[in-house]
């Protein structure tokens, strides 16, 4: 017959499980919380989703996750809750990325994107979209409705 663990050992294992879950939740949600703060900051500056972009001039005293301190950035947000969104990128020496609300990579854009700097129309579809997809677009389907576009 097997013996039960002492209550103190059971409690220690339970506490360790709670701690592990808390660390896991923190690591999972940290990028999401960080990106939601980007959306809030852009909204506070008057940027309208699916419509406006802002040019951010960075300096060494600006403390921002993953940005270079001497590079100007063009930032905007998209939201596919009301249907597909098109981002038209002009030809040129542009390097960019789109990330979903959880800061998970969607696509590269510009020189590192599928169009390799030749310019293109990116079509962002809502999750679970099952409608027609027109020709002539680079199609992306983020896992969330909201996404961030960062160009430089």
Predicted regions and their residues:
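A compositional/structural signature for long, glycine/proline-rich flexible linkers
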Residues: 1-152
